[in-house]
């Protein structure tokens, strides 16, 4: 798979 979920997502500011 291309994306492995769940995975730790970085906190990106809006």
From Swiss-Prot:
Disulfide bonds: none annotated. It is found in: Secreted. GO terms for biological process: regulation of blood pressure. The keyword Membrane does not apply. Keywords: Hypotensive agent, Metalloenzyme inhibitor, Metalloprotease inhibitor, Protease inhibitor, Pyrrolidone carboxylic acid, Secreted, Toxin. GO terms for cellular component: extracellular region. It comes from the Eukaryota. Expressed by the venom gland. The modification Pyrrolidone carboxylic acid is found at residues 1, 4. GO terms for molecular function: peptidase inhibitor activity; toxin activity. Bradykinin-potentiating peptide 11a-F is present only in female snakes. Belongs to the bradykinin-potentiating peptide family. This peptide both inhibits the activity of the angiotensin-converting enzyme (ACE) and enhances the action of bradykinin by inhibiting the peptidases that inactivate it. It acts as an indirect hypotensive agent. Bradykinin-potentiating peptide 11a-F has much lower activity than BPP-11a. This is Bradykinin-potentiating peptide 14a. It comes from Bothrops jararaca (Jararaca). The lineage of its organism: Eukaryota, Metazoa, Chordata, Craniata, Vertebrata.
